């Protein structure tokens, strides 16, 4: 992620520090033949990149071929961005997805939120996405029984196959 600003630090200083550090991370990644995927965060998680527009500005500032994009469905929904917004801005640089349900946010298991699972999959497919879908169900409701989130998500996928 882009990180956060220190409480006594300007957003500009935090941005510059983050960009400089991300270039170092990407240089290391290049030397080891790996890619780095970065996500926008929700406004309560970071002050640096919360939207497609801000994430695009960040990637432009870092300007490194190893830096790619992860769509986080929670952050995306929080600022009313769409899957299509991400592909319009980043195209094939979208290499990973935190594929979760939400109301509109919440990092919920599929079927616990209000997102349209089938339509989201169709939108990814329409854009030629062939990357991974990480199930990032990190809501406190799953802390005691985390497997329930996976079971709900698998059930939601199974229901798609029977329709």
Regions found by a protein language model. Give the residues of each.
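Short loop/turn motifs enriched for small/polar and acidic residues
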Residues: 39-41, 74, 138
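Histidine-acidic metal/acid-base catalytic patches
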Residues: 49-70, 77-163
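Active-site acidic/histidine proton-transfer and metal-coordination neighborhood
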Residues: 1-69, 78
């Amino acid at each position: 992620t882009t990180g956060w600003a220190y409480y006594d630090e300007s957003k500009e200083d935090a941005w510059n520090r983050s960009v400089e550090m991300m270039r170092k991370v990407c240089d290391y990644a290049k030397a080891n033949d790996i890619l780095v995927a970065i996500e926008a965060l929700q406004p309560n998680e970071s002050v640096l990149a919360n939207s497609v527009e801000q994430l695009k500005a960040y990637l432009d500032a870092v300007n490194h071929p190893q830096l790619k994009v992860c769509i986080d469905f929670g952050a995306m929904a929080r600022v009313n961005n769409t899957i299509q917004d991400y592909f319009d801005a980043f195209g094939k640089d979208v290499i990973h997805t935190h594929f979760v349900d939400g109301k509109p946010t919440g990092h919920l298991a599929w079927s616990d939120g209000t997102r349209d699972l089938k339509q989201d999959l169709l939108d990814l497919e329409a854009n030629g996405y062939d990357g991974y879908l990480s199930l990032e169900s990190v809501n406190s409701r799953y802390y005691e029984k985390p497997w329930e989130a996976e079971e709900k998500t698998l059930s939601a996928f199974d229901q798609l196959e029977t329709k």
